[in-house]
């Protein structure tokens, strides 16, 4: 076990109240120690490294200037919250990040009073902060609200909706735009620091308010002329004309790694008590750790790593990942069909569409963190005869549900939806679990909904989606590696709405939707050994259901169990509805539906989550035995 870093100053800081006792001159050393602590912790657990390293000075400055937790501090997404957790009473648990029963990798209300609003999905902080700021006004409270949002999250429409509303309400809200894209070089020198202090001070704001009153008195024409001159003059020096026109005081850009810049600006904004204010802070992802500075993209989310070399631990996979199988199959099909295009919402690497972009750069589009736009953009392409693959994580597809319904499904447009990270995702917990896509897509008329049982099936589904022009079609697959099956040279076109029998039996039928098929086959071995002859079927489709297959299973078995890594209301619910409507439950057929439990399951390894849910080999066997009134035989499902 490597030795913990020496952190004499950080050892004095348990909560922000302790931090506020330090002198300004001590803060650079504190920042170095927080970085050392964070690097050591994440090297042991894995997690999001680069974003947190980039906001160490900013986080310290905010907690130094503002009276948290009475003043509310909200982080957008939360990838950058690790320094915040270290400084807010959670340092003793920081090496449990993203582990079972450990600290969340995001802010969580249930975890600390210093986390006033939970985060994990993008672009929510300004809206939540505005709600809190208005609540403070209604309470006649002087508490401040600070929302920290990254430049990536500012690409989503929700952020601008909130900015527009905050400006119209003249809310006492402080928005800090953390610009770590390195598209703007951090300003340096005394003059830029002076201008930022001047722009945030009472004198400038008072003069600006006086100017507004004067121009209003003089009339609309002079108002427009003077306002335009003032705003463009400020925009020329410090930027921010757009934010000013939304009603925000704009300050910056300022160096987010300089306490000489951060502290006076934050103190001015705190003491002015006005709003809304937007402070543009420029930071560097991975700041203070050379490997992360040199390759920010590779150190955004990391496995466990060696602190000295930066080398990340890599487990040699037994099979290709589902994401890579999807990507390779799509590139293969795109080589043969120039109507195929790919769309991602700021996740080209995560979804595998970076491979399509490399092969066909003009046919792959990263639209930023804008899932709603991504789906309707895909609908427009489909309306013109193209074959768009809108590749999204299951949890992020939720953000675009109205567009899926209104712009795609109602119009019957053949948009293809590869749904990655379906089911349990492990360390990111309930905010990123792919729980609901089957349930919310199967409610839509005319939607084809598939799930891959293994990596070969995924390849078939890519080709099936390419060939299908009858309306929208989706196929889901999990995070991680496949099961190691033989791979076809090219996928086959599946018959829509038809499943398959994988193993024949006579007494119990296990009907799987998705990758739980492997556990169903293992469970069938145990059930056969216990004298319960078991059929295993792969549904392939949740919509349209394979009615013939379901009838066959119901009529020739004493018991049918549906198994899926999804929520209540999905595949199993549709099977149950069909069986009830057909009267196939009237003669005593035992039916059970295994799904993800109706709770928000906390972070753990996916295999542990499936075991807890009863979706693994042992859980399936146990369900059968309980339904039949039998105890689990010794040695079965061991």
UniProtKB/Swiss-Prot annotation:
Q: Which domain of life is it from?
A: Bacteria
Cofactors? Mg(2+); thiamine diphosphate
Which reaction equations make up its catalytic activity? D-glyceraldehyde 3-phosphate + pyruvate + H(+) = 1-deoxy-D-xylulose 5-phosphate + CO2
Record key words, sorted: Isoprene biosynthesis, Magnesium, Metal-binding, Thiamine biosynthesis, Thiamine pyrophosphate, Transferase
PROSITE patterns assigned: TRANSKETOLASE_1 (PS00801)
Gene3D superfamilies the record matches: 3.40.50.920, 3.40.50.970
- EC no. given is 2.2.1.7
* Record: residues binding thiamine diphosphate: 79, 120-122, 152-153, 180, 289, 371
Instruction: Specify the enzyme's EC class, one word.
Output: transferase
On cofactor binding, the record's note says: Binds 1 Mg(2+) ion per subunit. Binds 1 thiamine pyrophosphate per subunit.
Q: Name one GO molecular function term.
A: magnesium ion binding
Q: Pathway of this protein?
A: Metabolic intermediate biosynthesis; 1-deoxy-D-xylulose 5-phosphate biosynthesis; 1-deoxy-D-xylulose 5-phosphate from D-glyceraldehyde 3-phosphate and pyruvate: step 1/1
| GO biological process entries | 1-deoxy-D-xylulose 5-phosphate biosynthetic process; glyceraldehyde-3-phosphate metabolic process; terpenoid biosynthetic process; thiamine biosynthetic process
> What is an example of a Pfam family matching this protein?
DXP_synthase_N
Q: Where does Mg(2+) bind?
A: 151, 180
Its biological purpose is as follows: Catalyzes the acyloin condensation reaction between C atoms 2 and 3 of pyruvate and glyceraldehyde 3-phosphate to yield 1-deoxy-D-xylulose-5-phosphate (DXP).
Which family does the record claim for this protein? Belongs to the transketolase family. DXPS subfamily.
Q: How does it assemble?
A: Homodimer.
Instruction: Report what the protein is called.
Output: 1-deoxy-D-xylulose-5-phosphate synthase
What lineage does UniProt assign to this protein's organism? Bacteria, Pseudomonadati, Pseudomonadota, Alphaproteobacteria, Hyphomicrobiales
């Amino acid at each position: 076990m490597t030795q913990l870093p020496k952190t004499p100053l950080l050892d004095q800081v348990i909560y922000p109240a302790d931090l506020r006792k330090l002198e300004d001159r001590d803060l650079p050393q504190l920042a170095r120690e927080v970085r050392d602590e964070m690097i050591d912790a994440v090297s042991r657990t894995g997690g999001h490294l680069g974003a947190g390293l980039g906001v160490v000075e900013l986080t310290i400055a905010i907690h130094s200037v503002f009276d948290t937790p009475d003043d509310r501090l909200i982080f957008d997404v939360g990838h950058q919250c690790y320094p915040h957790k270290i400084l807010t009473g959670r340092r003793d648990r920081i090496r449990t990040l993203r582990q079972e029963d450990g600290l969340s990798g995001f802010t969580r209300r249930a975890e600390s009073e210093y986390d006033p609003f939970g985060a994990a999905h993008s672009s929510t902080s300004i809206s939540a902060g505005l709600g809190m700021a208005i609540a403070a006004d209604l309470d006649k409270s002087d508490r401040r609200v600070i929302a920290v949002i990254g430049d990536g999250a500012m690409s989503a429409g929700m952020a601008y909706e909130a900015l527009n509303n905050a400006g119209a309400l003249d809310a006492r809200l402080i928005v800090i735009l953390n610009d770590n894209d390195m598209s703007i070089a951090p300003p340096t020198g005394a003059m830029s620091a002076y201008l930022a202090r001047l722009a945030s001070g009472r004198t400038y704001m008072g003069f600006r308010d006086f100017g507004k009153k004067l121009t209003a008195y003089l009339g609309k024409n002079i108002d427009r002329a003077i306002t335009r001159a003032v705003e463009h003059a400020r925009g020329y020096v410090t930027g921010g004309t757009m934010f000013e026109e939304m009603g925000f005081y704009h300050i910056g850009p300022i160096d987010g790694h300089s306490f000489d810049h951060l502290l006076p600006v934050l103190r001015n904004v705190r003491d002015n008590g006005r709003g809304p204010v937007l402070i543009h802070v420029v930071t560097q992802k991975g700041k203070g750790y050379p490997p992360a500075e040199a390759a920010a993209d590779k150190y955004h989310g990391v496995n466990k790593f060696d602190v000295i070399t930066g080398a990340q631990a890599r487990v040699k996979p037994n099979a290709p990942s589902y994401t890579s199988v999807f990507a390779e199959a799509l590139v293969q099909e795109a080589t043969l069909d120039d109507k195929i295009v790919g769309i991602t919402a700021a996740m080209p690497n995560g979804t595998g569409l970076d491979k399509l972009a490399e092969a066909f750069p003009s046919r792959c589009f990263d639209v930023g963190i804008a899932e709603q736009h991504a789906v309707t953009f895909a609908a427009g392409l489909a309306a013109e005869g193209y074959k768009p693959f809108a590749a999204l994580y299951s949890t992020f597809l939720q953000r675009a549900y109205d567009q899926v319904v209104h712009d795609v499904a109602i119009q019957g447009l053949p948009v293809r939806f590869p749904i990655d990270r379906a089911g349990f995702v492990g360390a990111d917990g309930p905010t990123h679990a792919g729980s609901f896509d089957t349930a919310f897509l199967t409610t839509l008329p005319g939607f084809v909904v598939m799930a891959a049982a293994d990596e070969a099936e995924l390849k078939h589904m890519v080709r099936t989606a390419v060939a299908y022009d009858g309306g929208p079609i989706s196929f889901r697959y999990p995070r991680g590696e496949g099961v190691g099956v033989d791979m076809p040279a090219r996928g086959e076109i599946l018959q829509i709405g038809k499943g398959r029998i994988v193993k024949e039996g006579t007494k119990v039928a296990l009907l799987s939707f998705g990758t739980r098929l492997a556990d169903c086959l293992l469970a069938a071995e145990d059930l056969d050994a216990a004298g319960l002859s078991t059929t295993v079927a792969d549904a392939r489709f949740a919509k349209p259901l394979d009615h013939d297959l379901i009838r066959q299973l119901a009529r020739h078995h004493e018991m049918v169990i549906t198994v899926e890594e999804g929520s209540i209301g999905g595949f199993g619910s549709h099977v149950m509805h069909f069986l009830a409507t057909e009267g196939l439950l009237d003669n005593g057929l035992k039916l059970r539906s295994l799904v993800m439990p109706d709770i928000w399951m906390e972070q753990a390894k996916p295999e542990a989550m499936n075991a807890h849910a009863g979706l693994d080999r042992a859980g399936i066997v146990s369900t059968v035995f309980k339904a039949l009134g039998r105890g689990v035989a010794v040695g079965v499902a061991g």
